[in-house]
């Protein structure tokens, strides 16, 4: 039998996933910020098996490079085996054994790649229970209110597992059974190898079922064990997008609850979505309609939302981000962002800074205490500390061929509707007048004004727009003031 301490895990991910109706391989469909397969591999890596391999078939050329990336992230090898033709789960396991050493004789855990909520504790418990009983196989089971599509667990009157019958091959009475195969097993590898050689495709699907191994091993007189998982979501599989959405919602519910128990206020969990790799500090408040995605990091005592989506954004302690869409950006401690701000990749807002209503930023560094209050585009720019950018200003960064940068110093005050035509530098302490087009560098402490003196052409409306509402209003105003219509001869 198996030697304690020797563990290998085989993940079956060769199926085409036709019920997903998708060009994307089933195991690559995301939920909670990772693909289904990535979730599973991260969980298994925590168990630290000696060997970990994934069996691929359909779209293996798309999945294998991602597995290599995940292996690097996890700091451990993950082998790949190929099932050339889809001949069932039994054949997939036989192909997977080729990724293990020929003399491997320890515990072999087999699981499907579409069980994204399977966690390390459940796998570790399976291995421990299997090793303690020295069984030939231990299968995880769960009980479902609607077991349609799942293999049923057959037991004797003494409650011993005798076989697993697939739904397509089950009789009407067997389909009434609610205890189902969770698709996760721990095998004695030597016993498994022997049973695989005796599998038959004499079934409704004309495939080699891994589940048939149970009856074969029982026929050999070997001990069969089952471990029931009360939390069925942990072993639930995904075959279509309805199930994907259901498991995604369940995963999100667990993620949100974990943050709440850690000291985060989530006002409306039903409309708040948080990816698994997101971190949030204590006493932060998350308002309804907020999505925190990717590797977003939120500090403590922050206010985020409502109606905010942040992807790979870092937010410092005490910051406020309201009705904002941000990606690949950093918001400093005590800063305020929004409402209706758009932070594009490369945005860095310093501590106590402000990006107000209808401000868009991209590839821009905005210093400590600097304010961009409203209606402004800041792209490819570096702004110093404690400056103020007037409303409706634009950093004109594109000349039709390439992007160019603008540098604005510290303690700068710019008037509304200033255009910075890059490349240009505005020195520390400089000012610009309203409506200025900055085409040349502005020295420190200077006032830049590009507009000429205002010229009023009196009587223009009466002459050019006679009879218009504007002309009538102007005439009435002039008469009320006791004056003669502008431009009329005495």
From Swiss-Prot:
Region (Pyrophosphorylase), start-end ranges: 1-241
Keyword set, alphabetical order: Acyltransferase, Cell shape, Cell wall biogenesis/degradation, Cytoplasm, Magnesium, Metal-binding, Multifunctional enzyme, Nucleotidyltransferase, Peptidoglycan synthesis, Repeat, Transferase
Source organism, top-level taxon: Bacteria
Gene Ontology biological process: cell morphogenesis; cell wall organization; lipid A biosynthetic process; peptidoglycan biosynthetic process; regulation of cell shape; UDP-N-acetylglucosamine biosynthetic process
Residues holding Mg(2+): 114, 239
Listed cofactors: Mg(2+)
A GO cellular component entry from the record: membrane
Pfam families for this protein: Hexapep, NTP_transf_3
Region listing for Disordered, in residue ranges: 462-490
Binding site for acetyl-CoA: 391, 397-398, 416, 434
Entry EC no(s): 2.7.7.23, 2.3.1.157
Low complexity compositional bias, start-end: 467-490
Catalytic machinery residues: 374 (proton acceptor)
Name by which UniProt lists this protein: Bifunctional protein GlmU
């Amino acid at each position: 039998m198996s030697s304690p301490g020797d563990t290998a895990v085989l993940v079956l991910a060769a199926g085409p996933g036709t019920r997903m109706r998708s060009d994307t391989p089933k195991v690559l469909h995301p939920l909670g910020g990772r693909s289904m397969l990535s979730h599973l591999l991260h969980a298994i890596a925590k168990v630290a098996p000696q060997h970990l391999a994934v069996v691929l078939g359909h779209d293996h050329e798309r999945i294998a490079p991602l597995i290599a990336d995940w292996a690097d992230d996890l700091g451990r090898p993950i082998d790949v085996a190929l099932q050339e033709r889809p001949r069932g789960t039994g054949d997939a396991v036989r192909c997977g054994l080729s990724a293990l050493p020929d003399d491997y004789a320890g515990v072999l855990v087999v699981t499907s790649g579409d069980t994204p909520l399977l966690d390390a504790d459940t796998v570790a418990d399976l291995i421990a229970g299997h090793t303690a009983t020295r069984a030939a196989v231990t299968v995880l089971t769960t009980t479902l209110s609607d077991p349609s599509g799942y293999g049923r667990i057959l037991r004797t009157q003494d409650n011993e597992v005798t076989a697993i019958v697939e739904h397509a091959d089950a009789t009407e009475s067997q389909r009434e059974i609610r205890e189902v195969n969770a698709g996760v097993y721990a095998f004695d590898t030597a016993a498994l190898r022997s049973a695989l050689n005796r599998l038959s495709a004499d079934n409704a699907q004309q495939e080699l079922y891994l589940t048939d191994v149970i009856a074969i091993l029982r026929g050999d007189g070997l001990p069969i064990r089952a471990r029931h998982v009360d939390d069925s979501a942990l072993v639930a599989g995904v075959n279509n997008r309805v199930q994907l959405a259901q498991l995604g919602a369940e995963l999100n519910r667990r993620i949100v609850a974990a943050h709440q128990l850690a000291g985060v206020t989530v006002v409306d969990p039903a409309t708040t979505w948080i990816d698994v790799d997101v971190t949030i500090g204590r006493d932060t408040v998350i308002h309804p309609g907020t999505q925190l995605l990717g590797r977003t990091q939120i500090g403590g005592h922050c206010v985020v939302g409502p109606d905010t989506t942040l992807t790979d954004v870092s937010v410092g302690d005490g910051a406020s981000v309201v009705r904002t869409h941000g990606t690949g950006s950093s918001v400093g401690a005590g800063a305020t962002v929004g409402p209706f701000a758009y932070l594009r990749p490369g945005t860095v807002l310093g501590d106590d800074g402000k990006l107000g209503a209808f401000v868009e930023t991209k590839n821009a560094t905005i210093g400590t205490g600097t304010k961009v209050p409203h209606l402004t585009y800041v792209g490819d720019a570096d702004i110093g500390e404690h400056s103020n950018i007037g409303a409706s200003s634009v950093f004109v960064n594109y000349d039709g061929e390439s992007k160019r940068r603008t540098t604005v110093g510290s303690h700068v005050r710019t008037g509304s509707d200033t255009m910075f035509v890059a490349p240009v530098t505005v020195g520390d302490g400089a000012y610009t007048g309203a409506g200025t087009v900055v085409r040349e560098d502005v020295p420190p402490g200077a006032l830049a004004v590009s507009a000429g003196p205002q010229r009023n052409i009196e009587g223009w409306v009466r002459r050019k727009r006679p009879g218009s509402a504007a002309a009538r209003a102007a005439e009435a105003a002039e008469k009320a003031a006791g004056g003669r219509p502008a431009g009329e001869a005495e």
